Amino acid sequence: MKKIILIFIFNVFLVNNSFALIEIDITRGNLDPLPIAVSPLHVDVKSENYEGIKIKELGEDISKIIEDNFKSTGLFNPLKKEAFVQKPDIAHLKPRFEDWRLIKAQALVTGKLLITDGKLKIEFRLWDLAATKETTALAFTTTPSNWRRVAHIISDKIYERLTGEEGYFDTRIIYVAESGPKEQRIKKLAIMDQDGANIKYLTLGNELVLTPRFNP
């Protein structure tokens, strides 16, 4: 018997953007992905560790999520960090545009990460390498546990700025998860980020679950 799993998708962060930085024709059949460099986040040396949180590793994780989000669209080609010439701390303040154009990048994302008074502060900037100027500056303050969502929100902002289309990375999916033997399947209602991470189960598996339902 064919199984049907119903998936609901809802966006938890909506932003309108009326213009694009770089025109990307998403209607063409054969699209060359836009080369984009996502520089590792610059971490203040005074904030390398905070209550067991390794800030440098956290910054790397945030950059990786942004890269993966861009790559998943097929519209962008995140360049390998091994090719980067400029250090993150210098690039975030004022990039040497010729260094980034040398590796064929057309857009550059830089960032800074620190923790102050128990709050995580993330700064990001988007640079147009052809026009040699900053086009977007973002700053978010949140709890350290919310870092993954902030990475998706930043991805949305940059995606919208580059394409003129609404981003969808800060989206969650509710679905029915199945496990156990074929004769005794256990069904649980679950929710996850659009990239498959941050899975949380909403039911224990002892209730009858057919499809997700929501109260208005």
Cite the ranges covered by each PLM segment.
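Conserved beta-propeller blade repeats
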Residues: 161, 206-216
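Amphipathic beta-strand/beta-sheet edge segments enriched in Tyr/Trp
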Residues: 22-26, 91-157
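Residue-level detector of Asp-centered blade-edge/turn motifs that repeat once per structural unit
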Residues: 165-169, 216
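Structural motif
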Residues: 117-121, 181-190
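Bacterial N-terminal signal peptides
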Residues: 7-17
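Multi-bladed beta-propeller domains
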Residues: 193-210
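Short beta-strand->alpha-helix linker/helix-N-cap micro-motif
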Residues: 25-96, 109-113
